[in-house]
Amino acid sequence: MTFSMRDLDQALQGAGQKSGIEIWRIENFKPVTVPQESHGKFFTGDSYIVLKTTASRSGSLHHDIHYWLGKDSSQDEAGAVAVMTVELDSALGGRAVQYREVQGHETEKFLSYFKPCIIPQEGGVASGFNHVKPEEHQTRLYICKGKHVVRVKEVPFVRSTLNHEDVFILDTESKIFQFSGSKSSIQERAKALEVVQYIKDTYHDGKCDIAAVEDGRMMADAEAGEFWGLFGGFAPLPKKPAVNDDETAASDGIKLFSVEKGQTDAVEAECLTKELLDTNKCYILDCGLELFVWKGRSTSIDQRKSATEAAEEFFRSSEPPKSNLVSVMEGYETVMFRSKFDSWPASSTIAEPQQGRGKVAALLQRQGVNVQGLVKTSSSSSKDEPKPYIDGTGNLQVWRINCEEKILLEAAEQSKFYSGDCYILQYSYPGEDREEHLVGTWFGKQSVEEDRASAISLANKMVESMKFVPAQARINEGKEPIQFFVIMQSFITFKGGVSDAFKKYIAENDIPDTTYEAEGVALFRVQGSGPENMQAIQIEAASAGLNSSHCYILHGDSTVFTWCGNLTSSEDQELMERMLDLIKPNEPTKAQKEGSESEQFWELLGGKSEYPSQKIKRDGESDPHLFSCTYTNESLKATEIFNFTQDDLMTEDIFILDCHTEVFVWVGQQVDPKKKPQALDIGENFLKHDFLLENLASETPIYIVTEGNEPPFFTRFFTWDSSKSGMHGDSFQRKLAILTNKGKPLLDKPKRRVPAYSSRSTVPDKSQPRSRSMTFSPDRARVRGRSPAFNALAANFEKLNIRNQSTPPPMVSPMVRKLYPKSHAPDLSKIAPKSAIAARTALFEKPTPTSQEPPTSPSSSEATNQAEAPKSTSETNEEEAMSSINEDSKEEEAEEESSLPTFPYERLKTDSEDPVSDVDLTRREAYLTSVEFKEKFEMTKNEFYKLPKWKQNKLKMSVNLF
């Protein structure tokens, strides 16, 4: 028997179709919708269904169903609401996770929906309680527990209730007191302050005083005296007796039971493996305090209901009492459930239909069949390339590691790495309101441990000398993040290495030296999404390394070949031409097309053999997960924080943001100085433990980010307010300051000076001839047998570019302006005459020499500048010109936004039958009218653009605008 949405109670029909929270209260065994303004209000005599719908980065919807049982609700109602959740899950496709939530023992995920807390009120529908607020305020005492989410419970208003370990809130008619036990943590005190604010706003209409009382303050403190006076005077608090909390109660081990016709039978096995679970059955997994129900995909809805009812009975009769009951469907098991098994296979990914078509298309095209339209080309897939969230016009310096020293590379060699070596890069670039810095280490696959250790040590010293301002990155060959490629722009990886440690290692182990030689045989695979992100990777010179979806460069002693797979696009081939200009400039080439190769080509590759056709793709970025970490004696404990915000980042702690393709380690300002240097170890341990069982590779990029210096590619995961990290004190002191100072920070953090970046700059190298690798133009001479049509394509692909890299050209066309909205060329005719002359003069000024050593810190740089002689007239004029240009650029940007044409939604959506032409396809929403925008997104444009980019993209996906 199948169960569809129309079989549900009318109140539940249509649920779970968009992101958000939906709540139903059970009245007379029927669900009744709870209005949004009442979300978070629960009554002890009632039961509720809470549905959380989340849109993933892929655009699919994920559902979590919780049924909450008040302490005074009946068992019959609990059973009825449990069955309703099974029906709702079936109607939603049978993929939801179901949670049984008991008042006082709610899961952290459930509590995270209703931050800062829930405070259930007495009464309910069955008791006839009318939910009317009492006329007189009643003094109440609450205990607060939790560092990340707060569990609030009303306790007797007597002095003996207080203790040294916990945080308490005393709510009186005119003032709210927070009492912090001397042994309570700073994080618990800070979180309790959020509850104080909630009580003030909810029960006092925001009109009452707040007082913080610390354990140990005597009557001499006025607020402490007032607090103790409410308890009849001060008296020493007794020591809290040691008790076994539910969370620490011992279990008798994990037991598995099969459920048939409502009866449970133990499953005997030496160890738990997935093979014990039959897809035609349901099971109960007893884990002591936790209880799981597993439902096979082939089970009927009646079987699932029966298993749920059996689990409810199992739950009620257990000793000691259970805390949580979670139901999962086969194929959609939670991490917690899978972790209970000794053996659980990695999730097998189902091949996409597109990949299957790719193999067929390659085979047919080799036979001369036209396969246009059968597969998507790389130009369409390039749209899926993640955004870098980093400016590509900054200053770059690169050092190669040789034992314990670092050697600065010349500008022309900065993007050419050897697989047997290690490198350090320092990159400074303009941020939104300050100069941003990144110090990274790159480890080649063949590099030796000695060089890796030296690279980490030297990079740490660089970051320390800059007062820990830069973000720090650990990058491994083959797992480079998009930010790295945008910084390098045209990146080449050669086989072998040149460091002394590498040479010594291969000599001692009799390993052949395969280090790249310009005159030898070498094969390069070309990849990337555009001129700002392209790579040439040297691979084994064998035909098995070819791929129908890629372009290649092959050179021998005196011959250069290019090879284009049949599934490559014109953009792929253009990238190959660009990389060819870097690897073998000014040399004639022999173009080879798949299926019509010459014998000489195959001879260089050692003969012809089979090779794949599927495009080598990067792992996709997943939805971010935030973890709070403690690291003692090389043992890492990580606690996930659900539905996280910036406020969850506590200054005393270290957090990890896991995005699957990259991991961020965030270090708070108040973290113990002895633990700050362990940040990289914490990140590496996190990869090793793989807490989400997502098969994290040990080579996954790790970023170390310090509080107050978060780069844009980190803050994009939050709705970020930079002023919050500009406050003094610990988490408790900061939040208390916000409460008592009407939300104003104690101290505005000074902004770092933002230098003017007109183009990508590096250490100048006059000894090197100007490379022609990035100088395509309409007038470029034909080379390597290019046709006029190809040269025209090259001209359109590149445009004339003064920095020979990836930034937009100075004079931008309307289409280019859409692609590069932040890049503007100044129109000197619009600048005041004096400023225009200064700008022209500045072009002839000698460039300031670039230091080849990393700056010690922004503050020390400013101090040095102040000590220098007064600026020359030309320098002053240049600054005035730049200031004028920047102002004009801002005005131009504002005018551009306001002057965009508007189009109907039906013409802008991705599947439109009458699509609009000549619009920026990455910003379709910008062309909606204000009325239609608010109708589709349920918010204004200003509110929308304040959201993190990934959240904007999620919303755009949900309305077919991305």
From Swiss-Prot:
Disulfide bonds: none annotated. Gelsolin-like repeats lie at residues 29-79, 150-190, 262-305, 396-453, 534-574, 636-677. Residues 749-785, 845-917 are annotated as: Disordered. This is Villin-5. Disruption phenotype: Retarded pollen tube growth, but no effect on pollen germination, root hair growth, organization or amount of filamentous actin in pollen grains or tubes. Increased sensitivity to latrunculin B (LatB) and instability of actin filaments in pollen tubes. Decreased severing frequency of actin filaments. Vln2 and vln5 double mutants have pollen tubes curled and wider at some regions along the tube. They accumulate actin filaments at the tips of pollen tubes. Residues 845-862 have a biased composition (Low complexity). GO terms for biological process: actin filament capping; actin filament organization. The gene is VLN5. It comes from Arabidopsis thaliana.
